[in-house]
């Protein structure tokens, strides 16, 4: 009987064992960095009430109109797979009283879902790392988030391959004033607009500036600039932010047409971009969203955050040949030829793990000949092969082969293995 194979849904990819160690390295680098800055993890469901995203992201956005995975559950309630993390994080903070006279510095990591056209760097299920700081005013917290990003890029090895772009969206009344100016400009060029931009023109014209249509980029670049209509307070806030970047020694450029694809942003917005990934140039984006908590029924609360996609980080590191460097943890492969040797190998492996917690120890419990086991050892990427054959078991010795050099194989007493590893791998 021929049975059709069931495959993964288009745009939702498996991460296979050859790549998971690199993913884990990237994830752990993020986690370690945020812990060092005093941020705490929060977890929230991947499924939320659909109204959460319609209210926060904005109904006239590509995400809500075209990209959300929305369906009715068995009770007839409309629910949605989360397309981004900020709304769910804020909802959880309000629901559990985390913002009552408190400041919160939070991070999260997990899958998001958007029904986009799959392409390199853009998938229907993607993994996002997010950071949110709530209850803190001023530019200091914005600068801290930028510093966190820069630290992440340094730790991952590509700080010279990304550039920071910044802009200010001002206060809501300033955006409304700018909206009228922008609409007038766009109406003068109505015949050039694509259908999406024409539809956005009356309901959410700032989204036109977020268009990725190459035919509209010249029109967008020539559009009136929001920064030119900012009031004194917004100008002072943005100037303070830029001055802080200069004090911290963080290079940046002002991108006057930078807007965020989500409606809840205001004041400072930023993106980290690279010229290494073609059209998928943005690897991290964020900004201030002081009105979002109030939109969701909470008390007015200042807030700022950013998010980045792990798939694009992986692609960037792959493009820059950084993946091998990220996966260089020392490891040992123990070769055992029979049942007695396998038992000895298990005992030895536990002893090594106790004495050297940072070492990965791989034990081959499947047995087999030396040739096949050495192939497995090479494929594992291990630095050393520890060999327990019949001769070694009889003499209570272990043979050691460095798999990355031409150093001659040696044998030492089993009781000396931890002492040897301490010196050899130092």
Curated annotation (Swiss-Prot):
Q: Which GO terms describe its biological process?
A: histidyl-tRNA aminoacylation
Keyword line: Aminoacyl-tRNA synthetase, ATP-binding, Cytoplasm, Ligase, Nucleotide-binding, Protein biosynthesis
Where it mainly occurs, coarsely classed, is cytoplasm
MF term (GO), any? ATP binding
Q: Which InterPro entries match?
A: aa-tRNA-synth_II, aa-tRNA-synth_II/BPL/LPL, Anticodon-bd, Anticodon-bd_dom_sf, His-tRNA-ligase, HisRS-like_core, HisRS/HisZ, HisRS_anticodon
Enumerate the catalysed reactions: tRNA(His) + L-histidine + ATP = L-histidyl-tRNA(His) + AMP + diphosphate + H(+)
- Specify whether tRNA processing is a keyword of the entry: no
State the top-level EC class: ligase
Q: Which Gene3D superfamilies match?
A: Anticodon-binding domain, Bira Bifunctional Protein, Domain 2
Q: Which domain of life is it from?
A: Bacteria
EC code: 6.1.1.21
Location of the protein in the cell = Cytoplasm
What are the GO cellular component annotations?
A: cytoplasm
What family, per the record? Answer: Belongs to the class-II aminoacyl-tRNA synthetase family.
Q: What HAMAP family does the record point to?
A: His_tRNA_synth
How does this protein assemble? Homodimer.
The name on file for this protein is Histidine--tRNA ligase
* Record organism: Legionella pneumophila subsp. pneumophila (strain Philadelphia 1 / ATCC 33152 / DSM 7513)
The lineage is: Bacteria, Pseudomonadati, Pseudomonadota, Gammaproteobacteria, Legionellales
